[in-house]
Amino acid sequence: MENLNPNTILRVAVDLAKRVYQIHAVNQFEAVALTKAMTPGKFFDWCRSLPAGCMVAMESCSGAHYVGRRLAAMGLSPRIIAAHHVKPYRVAGAKAKNDANDAAAICEAASRPHLHSVPIKTA
């Protein structure tokens, strides 16, 4: 996974937390290209290597608008999705609620073309 070519990434989903962001990326064949936890600083550094216009999806939360503005400034396409739209794509089960599964559910929800997203608010 470290030899990953960022130009092959079609869509990235990130589960935002205070200290660690969980990343889930898929390629043009909808296959998982990367699943990794990163600090916010390393995440933004990594995002600079993504192709312009790459979709980066996240679940709506207090920090999502800040992250969305930073990603838009890098030339990426941020998409904030309301939590109730992500919930149907989560894996069922008692131990399924974790950051990695949440990021995968966000990625799956973002693949739906007619799913309403939250507009990014200005500072």
PLM regions: where:
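Phosphate- and other anionic-substrate recognition elements at nucleic-acid/protein interfaces
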Residues: 1-123
